[in-house]
Amino acid sequence: MPLYENKELSDNDLFRSVVLYGRNVASYKFALAKSLLEIDTTSSEIEIANLAVPFAKNICDHLIKNEKQVTSKTSKFLEACKRFNNAEINEEELKQTTIRMGFVNVIDAFHIVAREETTRFFTDNRSSNNSIILTDNFYKLKEKDIYGNLKNEAESRWNLWETAISLNVNPLLLQIINDDDQECLYVLDEKKKRQNITSSR
């Protein structure tokens, strides 16, 4: 049964499934989820040009903490983000690069979980106006008290994912340890060195 036909799952559950269980060969799905939860969504039509900078800066922030943001060896888009962090290109150049390269696959792949399509939180309108259009399902998320938690959950999952691929470990197999005193979660790398991944609060 496709996820969107499962009546027991709420829109919140389905959005979480995208973030938690969606197939990821790069961190773009996390960046897109966070950006959609952060930007002004008064208008349901979001132009890629307006989404580009928040999306790219989320990735730039994570590159500072962990350079491993893709399972492949290289990415021209990630190289541009690194150049921005190193002040080698400006924000406008980062924006234009993101418009060209940043959304090539993530828009199509966002709603795929376990090779099935889940409920759509936006539709692809790039062929008509280089934009996406938020659906009623997205706006239903904003009606819930836990809407603010979704961004934190996306961040936590992103931290876990990037830690796992930097250690060459399947994220599902990563052993996570809870530090009650410091209220954080961490893992041990191959040298038994501690790596904090997220708050446990």
What feature does the model see in each segment?
Residues M1-S200:
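Mixed-charge, low-complexity interaction segments
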